Amino acid sequence: MLSIRFKHALLMGLMKSLAGLAPGMSHLAFTGPGSSRQLCRYVLDQGYTKILVASDKILRELGVTEAAIKELLDAGVEVAYFDDIEPNPTFEQVDAGKHVLKAAGSQVIVAVGGGSVIDCAKIMSGAATSDEDPKNWVGFGKVKHETIPLFAIPTTAGTGSEATAGAVITNVQDHAKVVISGSSLLPKAAAVDPALQQGLPPAITAATGMDALTHAIEAYICTWDRGTRKEHAQVAIKTVFNALPKIYADASDHDARAAMAMAAYHAGLAINQVNVGNVHAIAHQFGAYYGVPHGLANAVVLPYVLEFSKGPAEAALAELANLVGVGADASTQGAKAQAFIDAVKALNAALDIGTALDAIKREDHAAIAQAAVLEAVSYPVPRLMMPADVLAMLDAMTV
């Protein structure tokens, strides 16, 4: 126990020091319906003539990818595609994408897709200009070389990867999802275009929306007070509670869809200033072991971690209760904090997201708990998890 707490304290001190030395991150955002066209025109204005479009096969089959880059296609520039990116992308997919990029002689990457596509494209952008194994970049600030310019067009309202300087990649051999972060991985520009997200099925809308909520909550209750993370988190949290149930009930609600696209972006800006937390430390293991979609994993884990964190995070959770308009009759700060946690549970229920996952196997509990604890020590969490804490949550989440 002491070694885990000591390591956490050491890492938090080191990361705060590094944050003070880190260069400022420059990021341009185009927002609103049709903003993908603006981004493409911006790319063309930079003089790029050979472009790699990273996407996935489903988006290409649906015509979403081509719709997003219509301005590029109409301009007649040389476009190559890499669409072998799957949920929970792997280092093998990064390597395959790098080879496609090099063979095409592409000068820039335009990523069209959800968080998996954008994260994979981030590491591809670094791998294309380095002979080093990307597995050596796990952690913070290890991508020190110049990367291929990356532009992002998200097609889901969830990960906020278009606004972050980090990527999550699966190491298949180790059953591990690892985080690689550094300022050079932040997309040069992004287009938050809700028009590209209109056809999302309700289940994906729900899971990705809860992913955005998780990002915002973890940024809000973390112990590292930096920049405008609270302001961005507040915008995201209030918007998700208001807009997500509306889109889930009526996929044609364009105003709610546009609001959720911006909520995910604000949540991404929030975690980019601090980091994620215990929810992600556990949810990443579900993705690595079982391929559970990241948003769904976060949604299921979130209430358990909030209950676990309630003591030290009580004041912050009570503030969030006020933000979303729950717990007005609560007589204590603790009761108000509980009202917010209950509101998160109720939101999950309204979105038909359960409290357990069929995929989890009891024989994996010990390994998952150990991996989650080791990951969480690098996050500014309000309460540090021990293996027994994770095991208790896993037991409740296992069918």
Kindly label every feature range from the protein language model:
Residues 1-81:
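An N-terminal, well-structured beta->alpha segment
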Residues 52, 60-132, 246-257:
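N-terminal small/polar loop signature for handling phosphorylated ligands or for N-terminal nucleophile
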Residues 92-195:
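Glycine/threonine-rich beta-strand-loop-alpha-helix active-site module
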Residues 158, 265-298, 375-380:
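Glycine-rich phosphate/pyrophosphate-binding beta-alpha loops
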Residues 166-274, 388:
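Carboxylate- and glycine-rich phosphate/diphosphate-binding segment that chelates Mg2+/Mn2+
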Residues 289-364:
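Gly/Pro-rich interdomain helix-loop hinge
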Residues 363-399:
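Short, amphipathic C-terminal "tail helix"
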